[in-house]
């Protein structure tokens, strides 16, 4: 009977291999992917925490750093600030193995070539027009002055009662204007005195501008019989030491300066 009792007790004892109850709900399937229930469970956990669950983030970060180091060379602090201010980041334009010192890599972004780019990236002109040499600009050439041009104009056609202030009011707006000189001479025959007028400018170019603008100018627009101005370059420009005009303008009478001696 004793043998039968012990055989019966051994049959009632659990097998040594069955110490842990199998839990198929928490075991990973053979494919290595979580089941449908586990996927829903993981998504709910991520929604609660707000951060996705990423495995081995250190390995991913190191691989990304190696990728960046292999695509674009490193910059110095000064170069990085210059490139960063222009909105250019690493991996510019999706062009691998192209440095910023290669002009061909920048032609497509700015259209057309510019000045040579320095190897260190300094002095690069992104989208700015380089300064032009004033000599190389093609503009209208200034009008050629006649050979008898001078900085003094001789004026004819002024009324006999005009004043120096009135004449100066006509010529003062022109650039380079300096002064007006009026000389009144008695007429050979009875009549109004002859007014000699000289206007001095800074240079012949300024005098030529006034001559071109005022040639044929009508002094009095209300009076229909008003004379028109006639301007020409003076042959002997500049005031005389005595304050009067030089012997310029139209030829004088036959007695001239000899008759005064």
Curated annotation (Swiss-Prot):
Keyword ATP-binding assigned: no
Domain RRM: 151-236
GO MF annotations, alphabetized: mRNA binding
A GO CC term assigned to this protein in UniProt: nuclear speck
Region (Disordered): 1-38, 232-261
Short name of any one Pfam family annotated for the protein: RRM_1
Tissue specificity: Ubiquitous.
Protein name: RNA-binding protein 1
Organism: Medicago truncatula
Gene behind this protein: RBP1
């Amino acid at each position: 009977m004793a043998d039968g009792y012990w055989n019966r007790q051994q049959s009632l004892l659990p097998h040594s291999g069955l110490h842990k109850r199998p839990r198929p709900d928490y075991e990973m399937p053979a494919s290595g992917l979580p089941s449908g229930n586990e996927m829903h469970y993981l998504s709910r956990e991520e929604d609660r925490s707000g951060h996705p669950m990423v495995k081995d983030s250190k390995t991913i970060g190191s691989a990304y750093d190696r990728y960046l180091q292999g695509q674009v060379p490193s910059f110095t602090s000064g170069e990085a600030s210059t490139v960063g201010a222009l909105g250019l980041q690493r991996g510019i334009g999706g062009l691998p193995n192209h440095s910023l010192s290669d002009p061909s890599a920048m032609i497509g972004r700015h259209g057309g070539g510019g000045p040579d780019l320095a190897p260190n990236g300094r002095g690069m002109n992104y989208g700015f027009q380089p300064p032009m040499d004033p000599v190389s600009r093609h503009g209208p050439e200034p009008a050629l002055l006649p050979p008898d041009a001078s900085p003094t104009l001789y004026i004819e056609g002024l009324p006999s009662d005009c004043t120096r202030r009135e004449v100066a009011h006509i010529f003062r707006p022109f650039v380079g204007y300096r002064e007006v000189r009026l000389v009144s001479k008695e007429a050979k025959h009875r009549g109004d005195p002859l007014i000699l007028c000289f206007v001095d400018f800074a240079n012949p170019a300024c005098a030529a501008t006034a001559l071109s603008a005022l040639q044929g100018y009508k002094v009095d627009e209300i009076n229909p019989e008003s004379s028109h101005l006639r301007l020409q370059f003076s042959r002997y420009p500049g005031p005389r030491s005595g304050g009067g005009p030089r012997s310029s303008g139209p030829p004088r009478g036959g007695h001239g300066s000899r008759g005064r001696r």
